[in-house]
Structure formats: structure tokens, C-alpha cells
């Protein structure tokens, strides 16, 4: 359960909590099931773009856990300047500092690129080793850690068409209060809206009907990044597990809702496959079944949200009663 990884930057933040304390990091995954994405001018649904920023995560990481996230990457400066800053941070890193950098995973063939994206912007953590020519790479999202050649890592930063980086100095990690956790849940919870599913549906319809300048052939590129976005839905499992710890409901019930989450994730894989097939074969007759599948996925996710909100309210009431008893 604790090994679910769904978002590279959030996973880095949670890994720091996990390695430096016994504090529960799972609330930080709240709302990630509806995480930001972008649709480019060409109609590509993208998990990363210059239009997406992570300010929300930085703000709430400090609110919940008391740790300030410092953005060292300056988008106003050129790549060489930012690489120089990165080098200084790594080479002068105190023991309690975590240096997070965005690499292009497609430039690291030694590492598995399971989503087959190129470029593949991805956040992970870097530190020095006893060997000058090797760095230690900690990649929580892919559950990978080990030594890499320093020059290869630098190349994956330098030649990354995107860029980004943060550092966190860990002094003390605070345990979020139940009130803070509740505030974060409420802040991120979109009860009636599954934006990714609906935007994907609208885009596929437009491309199939070749509306607004779109072409059916554009669907292949349009849905390529869907698997990277789909795994964010696994963050529901973190939330269910977190509330179950207090509510103590059966494992059978927990598994039922995890299976519904899996239905959605696999549904995205199914839709991606069918959309690509429709584009490759020019068979617009497939559109109806694709739309029906997306509507089915939307209905399942709304059921998940209804149940999750019910559990949240029960959890909140129990926590409120606990605090009254303590008082």
C-alpha cells in the first residue's frame, strides 16, 4: 500500500517525510486524482507544460508538514546558469538537504522508461557519493535508487527541453493536525467533476469528427501521455487507506474500492488503445464505444468520490469526538 507512486514531485516530497520521520505522508496525496494537466495547441493532453506550476503543493507541504520548499531553478535564466546553481547545491549539500531536479528520463537509457515518452520530464533527487565521477540518484516515483555516472545525470538535466528544481532543508517535520488534514481534503476535493475523463472525451469526439481544425490522425499523439496521467488515480487508494485506519472497516470493503480505482486506470489504457486504433484504421465507427467507455469510467469515479467523501465526513466526526474527549 505505501509503495503506490503516482506523481514524481509529490513522491519526492513524501519520500523525505518517510525517510526522516514516522509521520503519515498519505494526506499529501489528497486531490492528486484530479491533478493538473494541459492540452497543447495541437491537442496533445500533457502531464507537463510551462502552463502548469506546482505552487499548490509547495504551499500545502509547508502548511501540513512545516517544511519550506525552495525553488532553485530560475526560469528567467538560461540552462547553463541553472545547471551551475544545481552543481553548487549538490556539491555544498549539508546532510539534511534534499536536492530535487527535473531530468529528461529519455536521455538516461540505463533507467527504465516504462511510459516510452520522449522527452520524459521527471523529478528525482541527487546527492554526491565518495566517488567524484558518480552521483547517488533517488527516484521515489519509480522506486529506484543507486549510483549513476555524474556526466550522464548532468546531460539529462542540461539537454532536458524543460527544466525545474527545488531543495528542502529538513530541520523538523511537524505532524499535521486533523483540522489541517481536513482543510486540505476540502481544498482539493472536486465532488462532481472528473476533468481528465471529460476533456479526453471531448477531444476524442472533436478529432474523430475533425472539428476545430483537428484531424483524426492527431489522436495518436493526443493520447500518448494518458498512462502517465492515469496512474494519478491510484492516489484514491492512499486516501481510502488513510481513512480506514481510523474507521476500521473491513478489508473486503477496502479492496472493493481499490478494484474500482483499478477499473478507471485500466479504462484509460483501454480508451488509449481504442483511440489509437480508430486513428490508425480510420474507423470512426469505433467512436461510440469509446465514448460509452469514458462515460462508464466517469460514473465509476463519481461513485468513488461519493464514498470517499462519506468516509472523510465519518473520519472527521470521529477525530472531532476524539479531540473533545482529550479536552
UniProtKB/Swiss-Prot annotation:
MF annotations from Gene Ontology: acyltransferase activity
Enzyme nomenclature, EC number: 2.3.2.-
A family per Pfam: DUF6005
Catalytic function, reaction form: N(8)-citryl-spermidine + 3,4-dihydroxybenzoyl-[aryl-carrier protein] = N(1)-(3,4-dihydroxybenzoyl)-N(8)-citryl-spermidine + holo-[aryl-carrier protein] + H(+); N(8),N'(8)-citryl-bis(spermidine) + 3,4-dihydroxybenzoyl-[aryl-carrier protein] = N(1)-(3,4-dihydroxybenzoyl)-N(8),N'(8)-citryl-bis(spermidine) + holo-[aryl-carrier protein] + H(+); N(1)-(3,4-dihydroxybenzoyl)-N(8),N'(8)-citryl-bis(spermidine) + 3,4-dihydroxybenzoyl-[aryl-carrier protein] = petrobactin + holo-[aryl-carrier protein] + H(+)
Knockout mutant characteristics: The deletion mutant cannot produce petrobactin on iron-depleted medium. In vitro analysis show that mutants grow to a very limited extent as vegetative cells in iron-depleted medium but are not able to outgrow from spores under the same culture conditions.
Domain of life per record: Bacteria
Keyword Glycoprotein: no
Entry keywords, A to Z: Acyltransferase, Transferase
Keyword Transferase appears in the UniProt entry: yes
Pathway connected to this protein: Siderophore biosynthesis; petrobactin biosynthesis
InterPro entries the record matches: DUF6005 (IPR046047)
Function: Involved in the biosynthesis of petrobactin, a catecholate siderophore that functions in both iron acquisition and virulence. Transfers the activated 3,4-dihydroxybenzoate (3,4-DHBA) moiety from 3,4-DHBA-loaded AsbD to different receipient molecules, including N-citryl-spermidine, N8,N'8-citryl-bis(spermidine) and N1-(3,4-dihydroxybenzoyl)-N8,N'8-citryl-bis(spermidine). Also catalyzes the transfer of the activated 3,4-DHBA moiety from 3,4-DHBA-loaded AsbD to spermidine to generate DHB-spermidine (DHB-SP).
Protein name (record): Petrobactin synthase
Source species of the chain: Bacillus anthracis
Taxonomic path: Bacteria, Bacillati, Bacillota, Bacilli, Bacillales
Amino acid at each position: 500500500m505505501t509503495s503506490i507512486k503516482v506523481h514524481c514531485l509529490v513522491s519526492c516530497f513524501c519520500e523525505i517525510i518517510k525517510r526522516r520521520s514516522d509521520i503519515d505522508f498519505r494526506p499529501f496525496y489528497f486531490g492528486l486524482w484530479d491533478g493538473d494537466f494541459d492540452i497543447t495547441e495541437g491537442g496533445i493532453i500533457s502531464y507537463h507544460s510551462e502552463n502548469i506550476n506546482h505552487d499548490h503543493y509547495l504551499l500545502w507541504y509547508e502548511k501540513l508538514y512545516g517544511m519550506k520548499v525552495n525553488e532553485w531553478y530560475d526560469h528567467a535564466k538560461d540552462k547553463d546558469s541553472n545547471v551551475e546553481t544545481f552543481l553548487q547545491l549538490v556539491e555544498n549539500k549539508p546532510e539534511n538537504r534534499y536536492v530535487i531536479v527535473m531530468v529528461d528520463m529519455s536521455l538516461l537509457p540505463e533507467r527504465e522508461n516504462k511510459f516510452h515518452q520522449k522527452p520524459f520530464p521527471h523529478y528525482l533527487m541527487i546527492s554526491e557519493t565518495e566517488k567524484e565521477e558518480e552521483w547517488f540518484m533517488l527516484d521515489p516515483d519509480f522506486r529506484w535508487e543507486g549510483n549513476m555516472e555524474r556526466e550522464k545525470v548532468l546531460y539529462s538535466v542540461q539537454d532536458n527541453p524543460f527544466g525545474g528544481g527545488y531543495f528542502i532543508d529538513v530541520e523538523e517535520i511537524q505532524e499535521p493536525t486533523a483540522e489541517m488534514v481536513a482543510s486540505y481534503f476540502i481544498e482539493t476535493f472536486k465532488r462532481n467533476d472528473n476533468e481528465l475523463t471529460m476533456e479526453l472525451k471531448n477531444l476524442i469526439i472533436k478529432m474523430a469528427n475533425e472539428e476545430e481544425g483537428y484531424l483524426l490522425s492527431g489522436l495518436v499523439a493526443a493520447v500518448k501521455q494518458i498512462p502517465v496521467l492515469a496512474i494519478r488515480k491510484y492516489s484514491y487508494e492512499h486516501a481510502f487507506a488513510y481513512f480506514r485506519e481510523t474507521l476500521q472497516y473491513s478489508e473486503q470493503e477496502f479492496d472493493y474500492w481499490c478494484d474500482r480505482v483499478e477499473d478507471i486506470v485500466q479504462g484509460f489504457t483501454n480508451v488509449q488503445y481504442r483511440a489509437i486504433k480508430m486513428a490508425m484504421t480510420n474507423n470512426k465507427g469505433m467512436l461510440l464505444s469509446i465514448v460509452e467507455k469514458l462515460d462508464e469510467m466517469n460514473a465509476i469515479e463519481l461513485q468513488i468520490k461519493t464514498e470517499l467523501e462519506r468516509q472523510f465526513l465519518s473520519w472527521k466526526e470521529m477525530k472531532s469526538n476524539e479531540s473533545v474527549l482529550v479536552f
